[in-house]
Amino acid sequence: MKLSALAIAAFSTLAFGVAAEADDNFPGAPGVIALGGKCQKLVVAKFDATKGCKGELASVTLVNGTVTFIFTSDGKLLGFQGDGKGIKPASNGNARLPLSLVTTGVGNKMTGEVKVAGFCTFGNPYAGKPTAIECTAESKDSAFTGSFRTSGKAPVQKNGGK
């Protein structure tokens, strides 16, 4: 009996330790999370879409490690996408994701993509305080900017995204 209790305690500690570690490694494991807060800026080429930008940002991590931060404005989607394996530390405890694509869509479906160079800089939204997610990218023809400040509340796991 004592061995079983120890095994359960060890398993529980391991399980909770892994969950906490995943939170510390935002954007983390494959899936979709929603971050509440305020969209501070969203610009596509010369069009300023900030006024219609929603107070929710999606972070999508695919099984292959691709990470996309998706802004929504007036039913349209703008995603800043890069290889999560390329995330490096940045200043002030933030991290930096190099970008390779900007994706576009309507409703819940991404329908277009543009090759870009740029990056997203972000803090850990699980830290319990507001943090910024700021993305800038340039293609041959356009520039894209998205800036979002989280509320400080923990992100919410959504269905799908795998």
What is each residue range found by the language model?
Residues 1-5:
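Positively charged n-region of N-terminal signal peptides that target proteins for export
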Residues 7-15:
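Bacterial N-terminal signal peptides
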Residues 16-22:
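Sec/Tat signal peptide C-region and signal peptidase I cleavage site
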Residues 22-96:
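An ectodomain-focused feature that recognizes extracytoplasmic/extracellular
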Residues 26-27, 81-85, 132, 136-162:
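Edge beta-strand at a domain terminus
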Residues 76, 87, 106, 127, ...:
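Generic "edge-of-domain/loop-turn" microfeature
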Residues 94-148:
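Acidic, glycine-rich flexible loop segments
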